[in-house]
């Protein structure tokens, strides 16, 4: 039995450089120190990784740059998983259907150069903690305020545009730019979809909140999106540029899943899965730092990892021809 113990650094670097296999067995096969896959699995189940582990890396960048908070969730697909902790049936905006998976709410900092930095996350597990997605959203807002974050705006889709959320953001002294459902009541029992909204936006009274500005945007697929904001005297171009930043969190989620093994934890325990999720984000942060410091594209970074192994294999096979 191996007496060595896995570490956060080793696990994160493994997730960063591997591209196909993310299991404890795979790590044990390539680890520079002797580790059995059982010892790695036990370590993953017993260690305690928390989202605050990556706030220490994010804090300097968030506090020194101007930017916005982007909030959105992603579903870790577990359609073939049964009797595994954290997995539940829930609605997926990507699939537009109910799917089995793990719900993950992320807060992301996007600065003026559109460089992104993970700030915090929560796992949606209502049977364990009794919290809704909006409860988690407000909790993350309070934590961000305690950490002295000062965003230009908080940006999210219509799922998080409840009155309680909007009022909290306002009370924290921040602006918000949120999607609004087409049947949202404004003015005297009018629906957004029934209003004539000019390109420069329309000032309306949001029931239970107060006066806001609303903009109407047509998506390429023909869908009409309504965006509300408490920004004073907003222009269409300004709101459009802020909403466009929401795309960065979609890129972040895709990279997490495709390159950091976010969905590939094989453990059945909730603690191990939580640890794996946090460590996946930490590995993404390490990868992003390398790209930024060395001026590498995402694809250059991937190629740098595998090209040495390919070169060695070429030498080996040519030698035996």
Regions found by a protein language model. Give the residues of each.
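Generic hydrophobic, aliphatic-rich segments that mediate packing or membrane embedding
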Residues: 23, 54, 67-69, 103, ...
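Active-site-proximal, Lys/Arg-enriched surface segment
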Residues: 13, 46-113
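Short, flexible loop/turn elements at secondary-structure junctions
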Residues: 31, 44, 73-75, 158-160, ...
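Alpha-helix C-cap/termination motif
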Residues: 30, 61-64, 147, 171-172
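Gly/serine-rich nucleotide phosphate-binding loop at the start of the catalytic core
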Residues: 1-49
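Single, function-defining residue in the core of a domain
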Residues: 2-4, 8-12, 18-20, 80-82, ...
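Residue-level signal for inorganic ion chemistry
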Residues: 27, 107, 282
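Short, motif-level signal for alpha-helix interfacial/capping segments enriched in acidic residues
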Residues: 43-61, 135-137, 226-232
